[in-house]
Curated annotation (Swiss-Prot):
Region of interest called Disordered, as start-end residue ranges on this chain: 1-72, 1177-1198
Transmembrane segments annotated in the record for this chain: 1749-1766
Protein's UniProt name: Trans-Golgi network-localized SYP41-interacting protein 1
GO CC terms, sorted: trans-Golgi network membrane
Keywords of the record: Coiled coil, Golgi apparatus, Membrane, Transmembrane, Transmembrane helix
Bilayer topology term: Single-pass type IV membrane protein
Record note on quaternary structure: Interacts with SYP41.
Source organism (scientific name): Arabidopsis thaliana (Mouse-ear cress)
Keyword ATP-binding: no
Cytoplasmic topological domain: 1-1748
Length: 1767
């Protein structure tokens, strides 16, 4: 990167060594800026290197694309790149031939920036040389005017001498002497006008004056020859016919023409440089802007790729939704089919209903017939009953004795409880009859009859008993034993009748359910399976449909969310497209301007090179090589012609050998500029390639736009179709819903009718069954009458057995009665009747058992409550334990913090820290305080939680208080304890609040201390700065100020100790907080102990609270902090006074110079401060014992708290005492410091006054010495040497013109040699200087002409290229405008499609709501279907049994249990059922009816989902097309940004050229630096430079003519003074020759590297030294002898000499990254480091050529790698 920087600098160094040897050390002193120009240019190269690297390496992404068009562009780019490289190689070879630089071989990395920098260097050197020549011309003007005066005086004197010689010499000797003296006086007066007023003081005699005049005349002759020779050279350089004619008369015309031409060239050069720098800046800015736009476009590409991926995902989602919607459509179709099936089923039901009606009619007929039979049976029953009554009456009349038997029979029936009522009556009758037979055995016949009757009754009873036993056995098989015992036979029969009715209903419902299940379209496998499996399948299908509805709803929600996200993304993309279109418009405008500027630059460069006049006017990019070659050939020919015409022999070539070095430098700069031109053309080609790529991308955008339009049309069509489909689906759905509701109502009505009919049938059947039962009973009663007769006989036989059993029973009863009488009952329960007694005993036993059960229940409740209370107590205990753990952790943290504070204090005692560390420690302590506060807040939170827990416990205890007496007592105890704990907690909370207040106060105090510490730090830093200034300015008083700084450092150490003490105090505050935390932990422990033992804890808690109050009072004591604040205030006041004294010292030193006195040593009292600080630290570190310990018992807690309070009090006392001593020591130290500083100030004031008096004395002595030197020099000269001096001057002029001219041109002296040799021969020094300056002026004019021609050619080439670029940019802008219009149309279409999408989204929302409703219904129906399937399977299994027999009750119960598991919204409106029918039956019918509706809804939902998926897929396609369009636009924007950056670089290069040419007179407004205006300004500057060069040539010719006239006059004078030559030859020739040889043979200064010589100067004055040398208005050549020469230069060229260019104009200022405003505040440190690395790297590269070579090799390899990767 820096390889091209070394070559021009080496050539510059050689040129300075070989060409500028005559300038010497004097010009180095007067023009120190001359050598630093190259350093500045070097800095330019280092600063511009990163931009060049960015400029030379185009991005790989911009050149390598995946399309075939990009491959073609790559090949085209490689071809143009090879052409530019060839052109660059040719330019470099031509530059080598012109400059003679052989070291440039192998350079491939030269860029336009490097070439422009070389041209700028060359123009700088030309400007410097031009200024020197202008100064020399002014000096020559002064000398010529003096010489004219001298010639006039000499002519007058010669005329007087010639007129006075014919007169007698002896007689007129006195008069001649008087005339000679007058002539010498006049000559001296004339010389005083040239050499100064000191000429009048040389010599008092005529001989001395004449000797002095001889020396002056010889000097003037030498100067005249030099001026004449220089004017001749200028005349030859200017080469005008007018000058050739006028030069013989006046050689000053050549000088005037040269001056004017150089002035014009200088103006043109400055304008050209300014323009060129401006163009370079613009070009650089443009390239940067292009790079930024490239990066933006790349980011946009990535974003678009992401959007593409998202759109693809959305497409897949849309396809999925479409599929789901298609499935929903199919399901909807299935639902329609189900609707048709339901209609068919409804028709079947109507037919079935008609059949049922016919059956009802038949059953009514059967009922009527049964009623007839019922009437007949009733008649027969009445007859039979009449007969039976007669029989019973006869029996009653005949045997009264049977009543007792009947009574006994009743008693037996009651005891046994197994016989029927009729049997009991018979038994009682038999018992009565038996008793009657026993009592009265009146008639045997009557007894026989009675026995027969009894036998008949017994037979009847036995028959009846057998029937009853059979019924009981049958019923026992049906019912359980418990049910059999609990019910009698009649009830059992009644229950059987009711069950029969229910079973008939269930069978009917079962049949209906079976028919409904059969009517449902089930698979073949399920249709053949059982009813339970069918119901299970229906339930599973219902649940599955419900899940599908949920899934569809979720998908619809996700689709809606994705659509909303896509809408947002579309809006963002639209905004980004608008921004990109705006940026594209801007880039098009800039690209158009850049192309126009480029073309104009190329055109102007071609015009300035002069090729336009030769027929080379129009050039394309392919002819630039030929144009540049021809321009360089022309320049080379001009240089050769000028060199051949100027000198005709080898001696002249040797004389201009030094000028060839300068030309080498010029051509190296030209070569660099041409390289930059090639780079610019390369960039232009890159821009053209990028524009082609942009055009291709625009075409691609158009294609994508067409595709987008097609996609939009398709999407619109699809959206229209979707809308139609959705509207149709909605209409169909609404119609289906309405049909479904109608069918439901019809089905409900039919069902209700069917249910009513079924109920009627059931009622009729029940009545029929009742009649049948009555008939059966009557028939059975008739049969039983016969059986009763037989039973009477059996009863007689059993009578005896019963009597025996009764006797046994009587004995048992007597025993039982005796045992009952023995039982002792309460008074309330006592009674005489044993049965009542037994009953009461049974009731009492039952009551006792119930009381026991209740007591057990209450006990269990109490136990449960106690368990709950214990669990809650355990929870509170665990919470308290957690609080204790938190407190223990807080204590550990606090102890750790205290240990860390102790370690910090120990470290502070060992090492003396600075104030910054003290502030950092204070901040760390503050942070630790914050941590402690945080822990305290956590403890408070824990305490609050404990209070809450306790309050919860209290509330729970209050609730449990009213349950049991024991629980109430425990509750009261716990409540009391809790209240006590609550009071203690409130007290602890108050103490913690007080502690918080104290901590807040301490924090405020610490904040004030930290602020004071910061102020102290500021004061100390200011003191350090002032002391450093004193050290720098007062070099002679360095020791005293060092002692003062030591004293200040000691005081700073004292301040540091004070800060350490403050930090110790802060540590003590932290320790106090730790103690507070320990106390709080102990309080918590005490609270826990109080929970166990409440008696002793109250008194001890009061003691703890008192101790805490004492600690709180101690902490609130702010005496120590107030003392610290007072001490710090006093300290800061004293330090402010010290600061004021130091400022007075520095101000006096700054005003009056160096210090010249010694200040008193400051006393070092650091030992005393250290001892006091150690005492203070020891006092701070003294802590009361057992402060950190935790008391094991409650007594020890109180004692430890008391000890802690006492320890804190003692600590405060010790701190106060030690702090007072420390404050007094600090005050004494500050007082001593004040004394020392006041003494130092007085000393400084005295020193300043003494220095001022010494300076005045030195000035007076210098004036005296100067006057003495003037008088001595005047006495040394004699007027008698005037004639010899004139002859020597003429001879010296001739010799110098003939022999010594070349030696004088080649003469170069170093600093020391120049001063030493100037003491021996001042005339020769001035002659060599003038000749050298004239030659430099001529060479500079030639160089300026050559560079102007080169600039003209390059400007013309650049103008043509810029014109081409502007045309291309206009084309690109037109295409871009079209693309923008198309994009706007696409956006309108997109907005319309978005509106459509929004409408579709609204429809989707509606469908979503419908789907949600349907999903809920579907879930319910699905559950019902599953349950129905199970029921159906069970019914299928039981179908055969149901046909023959009724369904068992157990199966029906399981069926209805499963139905109850299904949730149905409403079952009240089930058609075909009676409203009084059971709920389970209604639910079953509702489930069966809802299956078809759910299937239909599922189909509708699946269809809607498919349609939504299709719409989503279409919208995904639309979004993807829009993203592709935005990506294409981003690529075009990237390419346009690239072109803009390259044009900005080109414009910045032109601005730099203009800046170099215009210097401080800007031609273009800096606020409006457009490229076209820059090109125009550059053209104006070049033309002005050409005009200036022409005027300088004419002026040089005029000066040459003036010199020729003066030479003629000198020749005339030399002829007249031939008689004086013989006397002066022996005196002047030999010393002159010796001096010249010695001067010419002086060794040159060692040719060291100029970079090493310039390094220090460049490092010290990068900003202060301007690249243009500022010539002083008076240049003096100081000599060691008494001969002094001062040449006064008029102020005509002040505006040229003082035209100092600032570093900012040249780009030499190193601007930091932080000053640029581009770096945020977070990255300032990194930016400073980068700046430091940059500057240090620049210095290293300046001082180490190996590093430069390494960097160049690395950059070359990097370029090769990039080219390989691109190709």
């Amino acid at each position: 990167m820096h390889e091209k920087d070394d070559l021009p600098q080496d050539s510059i160094a050689d040129g300075i060594e070989n060409d500028d040897e005559s300038n010497g050390q004097e010009e180095e002193e007067l023009d120190p800026d001359q050598g630093t120009a190259f350093v500045d240019s070097k800095e330019d190269m280092f600063v511009d290197a990163p931009e060049e690297l960015n400029f030379d390496t185009p991005s790989k992404e911009a050149l390598t694309t995946d399309d075939d068009d990009n491959d073609d562009l790559g090949t085209h780019f490689n071809i143009e790149k090879g052409d530019w490289e060839k052109e660059l190689a040719g330019l470099q070879e031509q530059f080598k031939l012109l400059t003679g630089e052989n070291d440039l071989t192998g350079e491939d990395g030269n860029t336009t920036v490097d070439i422009v920098s070389r041209f700028s260097k060359f123009l700088k050197t030309a400007k410097e040389e031009r200024i020197q020549h202008e100064v020399a011309l002014k000096e020559l003007h002064g000398v010529i005017s003096g010489r004219d005066d001298e010639i006039a005086d000499l002519t007058t004197k010669i005329s007087e001498l010639s007129s006075s010689q014919p007169v007698s010499e002896m007689g007129d000797q006195a008069q001649n002497l008087e005339h000679l003296e007058a002539a010498t006086d006049r000559i001296m007066v004339s010389l005083s006008n040239v050499f100064g007023e000191g000429e009048l003081q040389y010599g008092s005699s005529i001989s001395e004056k004449l000797a002095h005049l001889e020396n002056r005349v010889s000097f003037l002759g030498a100067k005249y020859t030099e001026f004449y020779y220089g004017a001749d050279q200028l005349r030859k350089c200017l080469a005008s016919d007018v000058l050739d004619l006028s030069f013989q008369e006046d050689f000053g015309s050549a000088l005037g023409a040269a001056c004017s031409e150089l002035f014009e060239l200088k103006q043109k050069e400055a304008a050209f440089f300014e323009r060129l720098s401006h163009l370079e800046d613009e070009n650089r800015n443009f390239v940067e802007q292009v790079n930024r736009e490239k990066e933006m476009c790349e980011s946009m590409r990535t974003e678009f790729e992401k959007l593409k991926a998202e759109l693809e995902l959305e497409k897949t989602k849309c396809t999925n939704t479409k599929e789901k919607l298609s499935m929903a459509v199919t399901k909807g179709k299935a639902l329609v089919q189900n609707r048709d099936a339901l209609k068919h089923q409804l028709s079947e039901k109507t037919t079935e209903l008609a059949n049922r009606l016919t059956e009802l009619q038949e059953k009514e007929i059967a009922l009527e017939s049964s009623e007839v039979m019922k009437g007949q049976l009733e008649q027969s029953l009445t007859e039979k009953t009449d007969e039976l009554e007669k029989c019973y009456a006869e029996l009653n009349d005949r045997s009264v004795s049977l009543e007792a038997y009947e009574l006994t029979k009743k008693e037996l029936e009651q005891s046994l409880a197994e016989k029927t009522k009729e049997l009991e009556e018979c038994l009682t009758k038999l018992q009565e009859m038996s008793t009657a037979l026993d009592q009265s055995e009146l008639d045997k016949g009557e007894l026989a009859k009675s026995d027969a009757m009894v036998a008949s009754y017994q037979e009847m009873l036995s028959v009846r008993n057998s029937i009853i036993e059979n019924i009981e056995t049958i019923l026992s098989n049906i019912y359980t034993p418990e049910e059999g015992h609990s019910f009698d036979i009649v009830e059992k029969v009644r229950s059987l009748a009711e069950e029969r009715k229910e079973l008939t209903n269930v069978s009917q419902e079962y049949n209906r359910l079976k028919d409904l299940i059969v009517s449902i379209d089930l698979p073949e496998e399920m249709s053949q399976s059982s009813l339970e499996s069918r119901l299970a399948w229906l339930r599973e299908s219902f649940l599955q449909g419900k899940d599908e509805v949920n899934a569809l709803q979720n998908r619809i929600e996700s689709v809606s969310m994705s659509l909303s996200a896509e809408m947002e993304e579309k809006s963002n993309i639209r905004k980004e497209l608008d921004d990109l279109s705006f940026s594209l418009k801007k880039m098009e405008e800039t690209a158009e301007r850049g192309s126009l500027e480029r073309e104009e630059i190329v055109r102007r460069l071609v015009e300035t090179s002069g090729l336009m006049t030769e027929g080379v006017e129009d050039h394309t990019s392919s002819d630039i090589n030929l144009l540049v070659d021809r321009s360089f050939d022309k320049i080379e020919k001009q240089i050769r012609d000028s060199s051949d015409s100027s000198y005709g022999n080898e001696e002249i070539f040797e004389a201009f050998q030094s000028l060839l070095y300068v030309r080498d430098l010029e051509f190296s700069l030209c070569k660099e500029m041409l390289g930059e031109g090639e780079l610019i053309s390369f960039q232009v080609s890159n821009l053209s390639d990028e524009l082609k790529i942009a055009s291709q991308e625009l075409a691609f955008v158009k294609e994508e736009k067409i595709a987008l339009e097609k996609d939009l049309e398709r999407s619109e069509e699809k959206s229209a179709l979707l809308r139609d489909k959705l509207s149709m689906a909605i209409k169909k759905g609404k119609g289906l819903v309405q049909d479904r509701e109608k069918f439901k109502t019809q089905l409900d009505e039919k069902k209700s009718e069917i249910e009513k009919l079924m109920l009627e049938l059931q009622q009729l059947g029940g009545t029929v069954d009742g009649y049948k039962n009555q008939i059966d009973m009557l028939s059975r009663d008739l049969e039983r009458t016969k059986e009763l007769e037989t039973e009477l006989v059996a009863t007689k036989e059993e009578r005896d057995q019963l009597q025996q059993s009764l006797s046994l029973i009587d004995t048992l009863l007597q025993k039982v009665m005796k045992s009952v009488e023995i039982i002792a009952l309460p008074v309330d329960l006592a009674s005489e009747d044993p049965s009542e007694k037994i009953d009461r005993l049974a009731g009492y036993i039952q009551e006792v058992q119930l009381a026991r059960v209740e007591e057990q229940e209450e006990i269990e409740k109490v136990k449960s409550e106690v368990d709950a209370l214990t669990s809650k107590l355990a929870e509170t205990q665990t919470a308290l334990k957690l609080v204790e753990d938190a407190l223990s952790t807080a204590e550990d943290n606090i102890s750790r913090l205290t240990e860390e504070n102790r370690n910090v204090q120990a470290a502070k005692e060992n090492a003396e820290l600075e104030l910054q560390k003290a502030v950092a420690d204070a901040s760390s302590v503050a942070s630790e305080l914050d941590e402690v506060l945080a822990t305290k807040s956590t403890l408070e939170a824990a305490l609050m939680q404990a209070e809450r827990n306790i309050s919860d416990i209290i509330s729970e205890k209050e609730e449990a208080q009213g349950r049991t007496a024991t629980a109430e007592m425990e509750q009261e105890m716990l409540q009391k304890e809790a209240s006590i704990q609550k009071n203690k907690l409130t007290e602890a909370h108050s103490t913690i609040n007080s502690l918080e207040e104290t901590l807040a106060q301490t924090e405020s105090n610490m904040d004030s201390l930290s602020k004071q510490i910061e102020d102290d730090k500021v004061l100390t830093t200011s003191l350090k700065n002032e002391l450093e200034k004193l050290k720098i300015e007062a070099e002679f008083e360095r020791n005293k100020m060092a002692e003062a700084s030591l004293t200040i450092v000691s005081h700073e150490e004292a301040l540091m100790k004070a800060e350490n003490s403050l930090s110790a105090l802060q540590g003590e505050m932290v320790k106090a907080e730790g103690e507070i935390s320990t106390l709080s932990s102990k309080l918590n422990v005490c609270m826990e102990e109080l929970a166990g033992s409440s008696g002793n804890s109250q008194s001890k808690s009061l003691e703890i609270i008192t101790h805490l109050d004492n600690l709180q009072m101690l902490l609130k004591d702010g005496g120590l902090i107030s003392k610290v604040n007072e001490f710090l205030q006093r300290k800061f006041k004293s330090l402010r006074d010290v600061d004021v004294i130091a400022r007075d010292i520095t101000r006096n030193i700054g005003e009056n110079g160096l210090l010249a006195g010694e200040m008193g040593n400051a006393e070092d009292d650091s030992t005393e401060a250290k001892s006091l600080l150690s005492d203070l630290d020891n006092s701070v570190n003294t802590e009361p014992e057992n402060s950190q310990g935790s008391a094991a018992d409650e007594d020890e807690i109180s004692s430890s708290l008391r000890k802690m309070a006492e320890g804190v009090r003692l600590r405060n006392k010790t701190l106060e005492n030690n702090f007072e001593g420390f404050s007094t020591s600090i005050d004494t130290l500050i007082a001593t410091l004040m004394q020392n500083m006041t003494a130092a100030r007085a000393d400084v004031l005295n020193i300043v006054g003494h220095n001022s008096s010494l300076e005045e004395q030195v000035r007076s002595v210098e004036n005296i010495v100067r006057e003495q030197e003037n008088t001595i020099s005047a006495l040394q000269k004699d007027l008698s040497s005037l004639i010899s001096a004139c002859g020597a001057a003429a001879r010296e002029l001739q010799l110098e013109v003939k022999n010594n001219l070349l030696e004088l041109v080649q003469f170069q002296e170093n600093e020391n040699g120049g001063e030493m040799e100037s003491t021996e021969d001042p005339q020769e020094l001035h002659v060599s200087e003038c000749a050298q300056r004239i030659k430099e002026l001529s060479s500079a004019a030639e160089k300026a002409c050559a560079t102007l021609k080169l600039f003209e050619t390059t400007n013309n080439a650049a103008a043509t290229v810029i014109r081409d670029m502007e045309n291309r940019l206009t084309e690109a802008s037109v295409a871009l405008e079209k693309a923008v219009l198309e994009r706007d149309l696409n956006q309108t279409k997109v907005s319309s499609s978005e509106a459509k999408v929004e409408s579709l989204e609204e429809l989707c929302q509606d469908l979503k709501l419908q789907l949600e409703n349907l999903r809920v219904k579907e879930e319910k129906w699905h559950e019902k279907e599953v349950e129905l399937s199970t029921l159906y399977d069970k019914l299928l299994v039981q179908e055969q049994e149901a046909k023959e027999n009724l369904i068992p009750a157990s199966d029906m119960r399981t069926l209805f249990d499963k139905i109850n598991g299904i949730e149905v919204p409403s079952v009240d409106l089930v058609n075909g059922l009676d409203p009084q029918s059971p709920y389970d039956v209604k639910k079953l019918f509702a489930i069966v009816d809802s299956v078809t509706e759910m299937q239909h809804q599922i189909d509708i939902l699946s269809y809607g989902q498919k349609e939504l998926n299709s719409t989503l897929a279409e919208k995904d396609l639309e979004i993807q097309g829009l993203k592709k369009a935005t990506e294409a636009e981003s690529t075009t924007e990237l390419e346009l940004v690239k072109a803009k950056n390259e044009l900005s670089k080109l414009i910045s290069g032109l601005e730099k050229l203009l800046g170099i040419l215009a210097s401080n007179n800007p031609v273009v407004d800096p606020n409006f630096s457009e490229s076209w205006t820059l090109v125009q300004a550059l053209e104006k500057k070049i033309t002005s430079l050409l005009l200036e060069s022409e005027s300088s040539k004419s002026r040089a010719q005029e000066l040459g003519l003036k010199l020729a006239g003066s030479e003629k006059l000198v020749d005339k004078l030399s002829l007249r003074v031939k008689e004086f030559e013989e006397k002066l030859q022996t005196k002047a020739i030999q010393p002159d020759i010796v001096q010249e040889r010695s001067i010419f043979e002086t060794p040159r200064a060692p040719s060291t590297s100029e970079i090493s010589e310039i390094e220090d100067k460049g490092a010290l004055g990068i900003k202060s030294i301007s690249p243009v040398p500022t010539a002083a208005q008076v240049r003096t050549v100081r000599k060691g002898s008494t001969d002094h020469l001062s040449i006064n230069i008029d102020s005509e060229s002040e505006h040229l000499m003082n035209n100092n260019e600032t570093d900012e104009d040249k780009g030499h200022v190193f601007k930091s990254l932080n000053m640029s405003g581009l770096i945020p505040t977070q990255g300032k440190i990194i930016a400073d480091r980068v700046d430091g690395i940059w500057v240090s790297g620049g210095r290293v590269l300046m001082s180490r050529p190996q590093a430069r070579l390494g960097v160049m090799v690395y950059s070359l390899l990097l370029h090769l790698w990039l080219l390989a990767s691109i190709l």
